Curated annotation (Swiss-Prot):
One Pfam family of this chain: Aconitase_C
Keywords from the named record: Amino-acid biosynthesis, Branched-chain amino acid biosynthesis, Leucine biosynthesis, Lyase
Protein name per UniProt: 3-isopropylmalate dehydratase small subunit
High-level lineage: Bacteria, Pseudomonadati, Pseudomonadota, Betaproteobacteria, Burkholderiales
Enzyme Commission (EC) number: 4.2.1.33
Pathway connected to this protein: Amino-acid biosynthesis; L-leucine biosynthesis; L-leucine from 3-methyl-2-oxobutanoate: step 2/4
A GO MF label: 3-isopropylmalate dehydratase activity
Amino acid sequence: MEKFTVHTGVVAPLDRENVDTDAIIPKQFLKSIKRTGFGPNAFDEWRYLDHGEPGQDNSKRPLNPDFVLNQPRYQGASILVTRKNFGCGSSREHAPWALQQYGFRAIIAPSFADIFFNNCFKNGLLPIVLTEQQVDHLINETVAFNGYQLTIDLEAQVVRTPDGRDYPFEITAFRKYCLLNGFDDIGLTLRHADKIRQFEAERLAKQPWLNNKLVG
């Protein structure tokens, strides 16, 4: 998992409340057994004018010119600012996969759905909770200024604006540690690989029958 320390990026505003996971990545794209390839279908039903299906050549599909992420000024955005209850609806880890593979490193909102919030951390996507007033300011500034950028300093736990404001945010020490070091669940486990191998060796020495193969 990629480390998150300090990130500066272009901001895109998604001025909608209650954006659910089916809007983030529609259900027909959940059939894949891979964890990659979801970025082109993030917000598929809002992003394109036609109905999307797995395996399509998305470069040939008609774009919805009214959807905010299709506007030229927000191309390459890596920070999404949106409204409350983002990521609600059904539980699907594909939602943070799609957002991350689109190019987002962080999502800022007044609140998130719990399961989506947890899934973000497991996949290196940083969800940041700010007040509604702070989100209002960021959305207004993003709309007013082309190429509006924010800096997110995870170590300091602040969002820095171009006009010199620092918006602090909360994150648990464990989640912060994992993001700063790029550790997902597998990475955390592998840090203890030597102890796991030692435990297995000691267990088999004490209980050798556990190593016997079953015969039919």
